[in-house]
């Protein structure tokens, strides 16, 4: 999704959000990520003014007061954390671990296939379909990518074929390389 993202070319407009919209977004984030409650004031302070950067391909970036990209979404999908945020606060998103053989493919933006989640070295945390997940790697401490489960973990174990996680944002893509938006 962010493979060819460049902040100068890809961002079409930036809007300041009204306080009622800010409260709604905070409530949605806390509903989607209950473990985030103790850190939400560090990430998105109540008195801070948030902005939304509208990008090409129906992507929206949620910016905090400093201009850091903290969450993004595609169309009306769920808000997903950026990898920079996940590296600071790693435990509020469900984690799925891929084996060593899948690392280079995930780092090039490929979707995670079911065999990469069920082989020895991989580890799955039980989760439902359409759950936002952090994609971890065997032997690494930080997340490689952020994605959305296309099947529940039980279906992945039973089927073991096809795409298990659709990758949205990965290390060294355009969003990772972009600087804070002023």
Curated annotation (Swiss-Prot):
Changing residue 82 to A: No effect on translation regulation activity. Keywords: Cytoplasm, Translation regulation. Residues 93-172 form the PUA domain. It is found in: Cytoplasm. Changing residue 119 to A: Reduced translation regulation activity. Further reduced translation regulation activity. InterPro entries: MCT-1/Tma20, Pre-PUA, PUA, PUA-like_sf, Uncharacterised_CHP00451. One of its GO terms (biological process) is regulation of translation. It comes from the Eukaryota. One of its GO terms (molecular function) is RNA binding. Changing residue 125 to A: No effect on translation regulation activity. CDD domains: MCT1_N, PUA_MCTS-1-like. GO terms for cellular component: cytoplasm; protein-containing complex. It holds the Pfam family PUA. Its main location: cytoplasm. Interacts with DENR. Belongs to the MCTS1 family. Regulates translation as part of a complex with DENR. Specifically required for translational re-initiation in mRNAs containing upstream open reading frames (uORFs). Not required for standard translational initiation. Regulates expression of a subset of gene products including mbc, InR and EcR. This is Malignant T-cell-amplified sequence 1 homolog. It comes from Drosophila melanogaster.
